[in-house]
Each structure stands twice: as C-alpha cells, then as structure tokens.
C-alpha cells in the first residue's frame, strides 16, 4: 500500500487522482490551500516556504505534482498581465521543483519511490496558438525543469516523469473537454505503477504512450 502525496487535491484532476488512489487500495495524502477535508495545507505562492509546510509529511512512496493554475485573465502576447504571468510561473513551474526537494528525504526511505508531474498537451513546443500563453509557457518550463530534476536522483534509482492528461473535463479544462477525469486518473496511476528508472525524464500521454516535448 503506497503512500502518495497529491498536490491540489480539492477539485478537478487532483480530486479524481485522490479517488482513484483510494479505489486502488493506496493511501493518498492530498493538499489544499487551506487544509480542508483532512488534507495538508500547502500554498505554492512562495516556493521557499514549501519545506516548512511539508515537514510533517511522514513516510512517502510517491509524489504526484498536480496543483496548477490557468492565470492571469489577460495573457495575450499583446495584452499581458505580467505580474500574473510571473505568478503563474511561480505556481506552475517553480513550485513543482520545490515540492520534490522538500519531500525527497522521505521518498529516499521508500523501497520504490517515484515522482510524477502533471504537465499539459499545450506544453508541446509545436503548439503555436497564442491563447493562454502564460499557462502554455509555464507548462513548457515545468517540462524542462522536471527533465533536469530527473537526472539528479537517477543514480539513486528514483524515476521522475511527466504526464500529459489531455483536455480534461474540469473547471480548468471546461465541460467541452474530451477526457473524463476519472479515466485520466486511472491512466496516470497505471503509468506510476509501471514506472522504472529506464523511464526517468520521459513525457507520457495519460494513456501510456511516449510523447514529444
């Protein structure tokens, strides 16, 4: 029974991941901004404060970096809220590095530790549309950050991978999105189940196929 830390578990894909992990007999530990519903209170606005927020995490086998945001409201290349853009980069690109740094001592205690980060299909460098450019850039950035992270604990046998969940029917993805969050969550956990050090640094579709960065 693996203990899995899932960030941003109060709604959307994070809530679905929590349900899927419980159904699979695992022990998920969720995080929310305010610690509601027996979750850990975790805010990602200040990466330097993340270690202190997770100091009592306890034993851990897996991290799923899921928390993220699609902001600011104005994020066109010709009309950008730059403070909002910077905040998006903090939450979506920098904090996902601070979280594994904070919990790595606990992961090292596990017999089979793993790290997954939820990215986006819009992180793909071939996606040229200018809509939501701050979000797209933040997800492209987290891909590169996590590629780099994968090389650091590789000698210790700790694999790290990224997952593209597709367009998911959540508040962020919208009702018109194609993918059911529960199905996506099961796919993500299936990737985690078979993840080995040979897969470290890879980018997967939630269905399990490798995909291009």
Labelled PLM ranges:
Residues 7-19:
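N-terminal Rossmann NAD(P)H-binding glycine-rich loop of SDR-like oxidoreductase domains
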Residues 69, 76-89, 94-97, 108, ...:
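Catalytic loop of short-chain dehydrogenase/reductase
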Residues 155, 162-165, 174-213:
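C-terminal helical subdomain
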Residues 24-35:
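Conserved glycine-rich Rossmann-like NAD(P)H-binding loop of the short-chain dehydrogenase/reductase
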Residues 7, 60-70, 92, 117, ...:
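Rossmann-fold scaffold of SDR-type NAD(P)-dependent oxidoreductases
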């Amino acid at each position: 029974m693996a203990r899995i830390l899932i960030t941003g578990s109060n709604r959307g894909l994070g809530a679905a991941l929590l349900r899927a992990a419980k159904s699979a007999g695992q022990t998920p530990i969720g995080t929310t901004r305010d610690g509601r519903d027996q979750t850990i209170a975790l805010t990602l606005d200040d990466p330097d404060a993340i270690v202190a927020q997770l100091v009592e995490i306890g034993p851990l086998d897996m991290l799923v970096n899921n928390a993220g945001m699609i902001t600011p409201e104005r994020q066109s290349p010709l009309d950008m809220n730059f403070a909002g853009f910077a905040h998006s980069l903090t939450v979506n690109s920098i904090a996902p590095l601070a979280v594994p740094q904070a919990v790595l001592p606990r992961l090292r205690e596990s017999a089979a530790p793993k790290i997954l980060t939820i990215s986006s299909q819009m992180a793909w460098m071939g996606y040229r549309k200018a809509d939501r450019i701050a979000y797209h850039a933040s997800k492209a950035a987290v891909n590169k950050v996590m590629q780099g992270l994968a090389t650091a604990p590789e000698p210790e046998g700790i694999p790290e991978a990224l997952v593209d969940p597709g367009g998911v029917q959540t508040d962020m993805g919208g009702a018109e999105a194609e993918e059911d969050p529960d199905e996506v969550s099961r796919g993500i956990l299936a990737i985690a189940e078979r993840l080995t050090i040979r897969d470290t640094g890879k980018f997967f579709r939630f269905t399990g196929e490798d995909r291009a960065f």
